[in-house]
Design a protein with these regions (language model features):
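Long insertion/accessory domains within large nucleic-acid-processing enzymes
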Residues: 689-737
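Short, mixed-charge aromatic SLiMs
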Residues: 43-48, 64, 547-561, 723-735
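Conserved catalytic cores of very large enzyme subunits
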Residues: 86, 93-515, 536-537, 541-703
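Contiguous, well-ordered alpha-helical segments that form the cores/surfaces of helical PPI scaffolds
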Residues: 519-532, 553
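Short alpha-helix boundary/capping elements
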Residues: 64-71, 228, 534, 710
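Core of folded catalytic or high-affinity ligand/protein-binding domains
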Residues: 503, 515, 519-522, 721
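Charged, amphipathic alpha-helical regulatory modules used
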Residues: 1-100, 105, 722-728
């Protein structure tokens, strides 16, 4: 006779344990009846069949209740419940939750979350519970095991059971044309630029509550250009009244005509009266300046998610050549340069993204070239804006449709082709979910790094890699079943207000909207994969680099195949891996130990990036990474690390951007350099721990974590902190003319 333990182990039945458990219960109520205890023990023994522990305890309870010893039965039940609670209290999940609640286990997996705060602790504790439910009770066994074994990683696993989606480009035209409603009221359409800027922040905040990733505008200049006109008309009307001394009826006629014709703010209809026009423009510029500053301050102070998070916001701009659109872009860049707060510190959000395009802003004779120069000025001081390439070979823009213009959100997400009628339009679309393949895990098993073989087993690698790709496809489809089954009532702001496409078609489920979104197949650790397979990374050897490129190309091909099979939008994605860089590394160390240049550092290298420790020039880094950028159409980014003093040479900075976009076809570029602020006097430059002005060591050291900034790099998780300290400045290895 055997007993199945709670942990699944099978052991021989021990009658003494049954007898002793009954005697303990009897002793606790001073009613010791050894004969009854032996009788019950013998009856259980005579069943002579395999049982689990709970079945045996149920039999003891039932037999005690059937006897005259009801008090003993009650004592046994209490004892059993106490033991159950003790076991649960000592379980890994409960211990994890208790640690979260105490604020002692600070992981900083997301630099935008304050894990020390009450709401941050609550968020992380809830997250631990939801993750365990998803892995142990919801997912298919093979998918759960692949996650636990470290082959794949489900991002934001705590949202799996809820069916939330990741990120979205909001349809601002829709909500600003019709207004929008929230749970406690409704909002009229804005009638001025200042009101529109306030409502952008409100809409971003409300949308962020019904998803777990970033919220963005794919063309803020186009979204807000009409409100520049509305504000100008008001200021011009005031000028007519106070300078022109016109009566109300005359002013009403002038403005009515302007509105009917939707006249531009530079139309000669207005410029004819120089004094009134100058007044109106001056007041408009002042309003734009204050409104943009207000937007930036709001987006850095509206803590609307658990853990004191602000909405993860991104704004794209720079393409609208109308006077109104240009003023929107200028206002945003001026606000970025000005900074926030009493010390004019660099704003963390929004991630501002300048939409680079030849014929629009790339070259000196382009109409918006002055905005590019202003963007470079902002970049040199604030790290933002990033630059996105409208001329990228995979952009597929329609020059007559701004909704198709190249844009990114969050750390790097791009939204590609929609098979369900929207084509390359991005507005009202986003990403449903990313799942990342841990490439070094497969490579360790088939490479030379463990010493089991002298030559990599490439066939074995490809077989396993394709097996994992198929598993990722299955995992996406399983999660989508949960997502599409949700009611629109789960996200009323999004579905009632039409921030997402085809929300009006969603009645009992949200499939009609979510089908337009993408399913990202991500990857991490190309460098460590190559090292594990061949003993070199892709920055060190051309042949190794070609193999690495074939792996990423295969993900892209598989995404296309999965799109065809399922009539959904799969994409290849260069994963940001903020917390995953450390989580995946720890899993590999647990399984394989320390392997030089594979698991020997405290992080894995993001996507296909050249390892941060490699001493390469600016242009070599760009040239190495550029071929990879063709394939992750779901999003990628290229970084360059620079000295802060280098940023004073704006022409050199512009040359880097032009070379990356015009010569190398890189889609998305960001330049990194240190920004330090003395929090006692506000002095800003690279301070190296001490302020030269006031001597304070109360220094904020701002760095980029993945695609976004955070207030101080010491708030990153341990993996990202280690990476920051090992980042090589590529300027040190570059000869500049």
């Amino acid at each position: 006779m055997e007993v199945i333990k709670r942990d699944g182990r099978i052991v021989e039945f021990n009658a003494d344990k049954v007898f002793n458990a009954i005697i303990k219960a009897m002793t606790s109520v001073n009613n010791c009846n050894t004969a009854l205890a032996q009788k019950i023990t013998d009856e259980i023994t005579r069943t002579n069949c395999n049982m689990n522990v709970e079945t045996i305890q149920d039999m003891i309870e039932n037999k005690l209740m059937a006897s005259n010893c009801k008090d003993v039965a009650k004592a046994f039940i209490i004892y059993r419940n106490d033991r159950t609670k003790e076991r649960e209290r000592n379980s890994s999940l409960i211990q994890k939750v208790l640690e979260r609640n105490s604020g002692k286990n600070i992981q900083n997996s997301n630099a935008n979350v304050d894990e020390r705060s009450f709401s941050g602790r609550e968020k992380e504790a809830s997250s631990d519970i939801q993750k365990e439910i998803a892995l142990d009770y919801i997912m298919s066994k093979d998918i759960s095991n692949a996650h636990k074994d470290g082959y794949i990683y489900h991002h934001d696993l705590d949202k799996y059971n809820l069916g939330m989606h990741n990120c979205l480009f909001l349809d601002f035209y829709n909500i600003f044309t019709n207004g929008f409603s929230t749970r406690n009221g409704d909002v009229r359409p804005p009638t001025s630029f200042s009101t529109a800027c306030q409502l952008v922040a409100v809409a971003f905040q409300c949308q962020s509550q019904v998803q777990y990733g970033g919220v963005a505008s794919c063309h803020l200049d186009y979204d807000l250009n009409s409100f520049i006109k509305f504000s100008f008309y008001k200021h011009y009307a005031d000028g007519c009244k106070y300078i022109g001394h016109l009566n109300d009826e005359q002013i009403k006629t002038i403005i009515a005509y302007a509105k009917k014709k939707s006249l531009s703010i530079t139309d000669e209809y207005f410029t004819a009266d120089e004094e009134i026009y100058t007044y109106a423009i001056d007041m408009l510029v002042k309003e734009c300046e204050q409104s943009a500053q207000g937007l930036y301050h709001n987006l850095n102070t509206l803590e609307s998610r658990q853990g004191s998070q602000v909405p993860f916001t991104s704004i794209n701009f720079g393409r609208d050549t109308s006077p109104e659109g240009r003023l929107v872009s200028k206002s945003m860049l001026d606000a970025s340069i000005d900074g926030i707060g009493k010390f004019h510190r660099t704003s963390i959000f929004p991630i501002s993204i300048f939409q680079y395009k030849q014929g629009v802003n790339a070259n000196p004779d382009d109409p918006n070239y002055d905005l590019k120069q202003l963007a470079l000025k902002s970049l040199s001081k604030r790290i933002y804006p990033n630059f996105v390439n409208g001329d990228w070979s995979q952009a597929h823009e329609d020059e007559n449709d701004p909704d198709t213009f190249m844009a990114t959100m969050g750390c790097r997400t791009m939204i590609g082709y929609d098979r369900h009628g929207l084509g390359y339009s991005k507005v009202g679309r986003g990403n449903n979910n990313p799942i990342t393949i841990i490439l070094p895990k497969i490579a360790i098993e088939y490479g030379i790094c463990t010493g089991k073989r002298k030559v990599a087993n490439i066939d074995g690698f490809w077989n396993k890699f394709n097996e994992i790709l198929n598993l990722v496809e299955k995992a996406h489809l399983e999660r989508f079943e949960i997502m599409k089954a949700q009611s629109p009532q789960a996200a009323p702001f999004m579905y009632n207000n039409g921030t997402i496409k085809d929300s009006d078609k969603c009645v009992d489920s949200v499939y009609e909207s979510l089908k337009h979104n993408t399913f990202a197949i991500g990857y991490i650790g190309v460098a460590e994969m190559c090292q594990a397979l061949f003993g070199k990374n892709h920055a060190q050897d051309d042949t190794v680099r070609e193999f690495a490129l074939s792996v990423i190309k295969r993900i892209n091909e598989f995404a296309s195949e999965a799109s065809e099979r399922n009539n959904l939008n799969f994409s290849c994605y260069a994963t940001p891996a903020e917390g995953l860089c450390r989580t995946a590394l720890n899993n590999l160390r647990d399984q394989y130990g320390i392997i030089e240049n594979v698991t020997s550092r405290d992080y894995l290298t993001n996507s296909h990036h050249v390892p941060v420790w490699e001493k390469v020039s600016i242009y070599d880094k760009l040239r190495i990474e550029a071929p990879f950028c063709k394939y992750p159409t779901g999003g990628c980014i290229t970084y360059i690390e620079l000295e802060s003093t280098f940023m004073q040479n704006l022409k050199a900075v512009e040359d880097i951007i032009d070379y990356a976009f015009k010569e190398l076809d890189i889609p998305y570029l960001a330049l990194n350099f240190p920004i330090d602020t003395c929090l006692d006097c506000g002095y800003q430059e690279e301070l190296n721990g001490k302020c030269p002005k006031c001597g304070s060591t109360n220094i904020e050291e701002l760095r980029r974590v993945t695609g976004y900034l955070t207030t101080d790099w010491h708030k990153f998780n341990a993996g990202k902190q280690a990476e920051v300290q090992e980042r090589v400045k590529h300027t040190a290895y570059t000869e500049l003319s």
